[in-house]
Structures are given as C-alpha cells and as structure tokens.
Amino acid sequence: MDKTINWTGQRLTLRIEKVAHGGIFVARHEGRVVFVSHVLPGELVKAVVFEDRGGSFCRAEPIEIIEASEDRVPHFWKEAGTDGPQRALGVGGAGGAEFGHIKLERQRQLKADVIEEALQRMAGVELRPVVEPVPGDDEANGLGYRTRVQLHVDEAGEPGPYRERSHDVVPVKHLPLAVDEVNDLALHLKNWQDVKKIEVAVSNTGQVHYSVDKKPKQEGKLVERAAGRTFRISSGGFWQVHKGAADVLTKTVNEMVAVVGIDVDAPNLDLYGGVGLFAGALAAKFANRLRITTVESVKQATEDAKLNLADLPAVRAVCAPTERFAAEQASAVAAGEADYSRATVVVDPPRAGVGARVVGDLLTMAPLHIVYVACDPVALARDLKGLLAGGYQIKALKAFDLFPHTHHVETIVSLVRNSK
C-alpha cells in the first residue's frame, strides 16, 4: 500500500460493513479500510476523511446518511449528536455518548459482536456472549446512570466535556447520562474562569462530592454500599461509574466462584483490588474467615481497603503493583516456598489488561480458579490466549452493558485449571 496516499478532506460514498473495537465502524473504498464514526452496519453514507496517515486505512466522519438503518434513532443528547450543521461539517459532538444514535438493544448486539470477534481472532475461542443490561436501564433508556463525571472548562469559564477527538470544550447545561444529583449541582450556572477541570462523585448513600482542579470541596470519604457491605473511598479514588455496577459485578464474581467452589484456607487473591470490593464481597459471601489478600498499587486505595476490610480477620490489604507481587509469588512457587494450587484469584486490571508478564506469573502460580473482570475485550482476548495455552479452560463468560450509549462493555470470565 502506498504510504504517501492521503485522502484527507475527500468525500466518499461508503457502505458500512460492521462494527470495530473502539466504537467505530468499518467500510472499504478502493482497497482501503475506512473507519467511520456515528454510523451503523448496512447504512449507505457520504463521509469526509478527517485523518489519513497513508497505509491501509483512514478515518472519516459521516456528513450525510443516504440509507439509514432501522436501528438508528435520534440522538438523546443534542450536544453529542452529529445532526444539523455539525454533520455537514463532519465534526463530532461532545464525547462520551458515541452510541447514542443506536437503539439500546442493538448497541448490546454490537458490543457482543466486538467481544465475539476479539475472542475468535486473538484467542481462537468460538463464543458469542449475550450482553446483559443492568436492572433498570431499559426502563430509563440507558440514561441517568453515571455517578462519576469529569468536566473541563473553556476560556469563557463554561464547563462541559471535550469534543470527540479534541480538547475543545463543549459547554453543556445538562448531562443526560449522569445521575440526578450531578445535574442538580447546576454547574453551568457558575463561571469557572481559571479552572481547568471539575470532577463530581455521587455515592449510593446520598453523598455528593466534587473537586476543582484536584482540590476536594468536601471533607471525608465517600460511603458506598455494595454486596451488603459498606465501602469508604477517599477523594479521587476509584469506584465503578454505573450506579448499579458494583452489585452486578460482585454478584457475578461470587456466583462464578460458588460454581467452582473456594477453599477458605487457600492463599486466595484479589489482584488490582482497589478499595477491597471483590475481597470484601467474597469474604461476606463464603465465610468471614475466608483467607484472601487484596493487592493494589495506589497507597490511598490500599489504606481505604484496610479500613473497609478491618472486620475480616483473615483478609489483608497489600500495597504493591500487581506485576511485582505476582512475580514475587511466582518465584516463591518455583522455589517451593508457596503453593497456590488450591487458590482462587480474582483479577480486575485496568483497560490494558494484565499483560504477558502477569499471565506468565499466573501460569507459574497455577491457581485452581481465575476470575477475570475486564473492561476491554481486546486486552481480555489477548490475555486469554496465554492463559488458555497455559492450561486453563473457560468455565463461564458473562458480559454487561455498564456504559449504555458508549462502546464500552464489561466482561467477566471464569477460568479453571485443566486436570493434570
């Protein structure tokens, strides 16, 4: 392919073929792949190329929908849609709602397509999941679920999200994906001159905290309830974005563990453990004497985990990068100084996945059961390839739509070690 080719600015008529990872869609023109946003499979569109670095593909934005899919709906959020003048210019709207032009049921089918293709292409697994909604989301049309929001501020002091593919701020008066408590703050009524970023967090116990340029405006920790337990989170600490996510995820992990069984005396692990959500939920479900270590690299989150798990005598929280901790444990196993053969290990890594090093260390540790909680299907499939080749098999896989109207999807996989 000619590396010097450049279609930037050209207008192309394209038939959209399928969805791709990252919330974009695939078309082809003159032997090249064209990645197009804000469209649907089967649609015929006119699109303008906004990025072309040569090679086998370029990126485009639709400027006219010639033949629309029956799954297309008016975007629920005017500032994020591409209707009207923005479409004619090929300019995206506010980020964070890139699937807002698609019926909810079809969004989930597209997310299942992405998971299915990633598993097949990268892990050699033929499996199509059903992407399940969080209870209540269908009734709310997938709106009003975000409990964590980040807004940026433009030169005029008006807050809003970034425009897609840019650092231009789109001023907004309402955030349809956010819970009511966020919108009740009416942040748009205040001038935020000289401020760069506003972050808002709402707990399911009714607290509303926000920070301005990383400086908290309230004292104390946020208090969340999940899996029948109380969790305290320091300002800026991680908690699931969807108001129902923590309960859905802990319930699913606990169910997967129950099917396989858990040895309460084994050296069980909760890797990338955050504030202790999965460790606490497992201990509460299976026995308060469950032995489990939660491992987290962020010091403040580890301190929160110690507080949250203080009533569980056999649970400990360790502050360490999972990569270092896993390497140390793998070395101990290789030296005959540790035994994880009866253990259950929960991993909930960031978007990049656990990576080849941790996969290798897990294979050396050889726990009986691994439960992998993933927010990126491609990273998950890459890691599964190594785990499956190393002697594990998929016992169960479930997927959840924790981010309606976006391309993001959560997948949980139960892996058991093959009998030797």
How should each PLM-predicted stretch be described?
Residues 1-347, 352-360, 366:
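Accessory RNA-recognition modules of RNA-modification enzymes
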Residues 178, 322-332, 338-339, 355, ...:
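C-terminal catalytic and target-recognition region of SAM-dependent MTase-like enzymes
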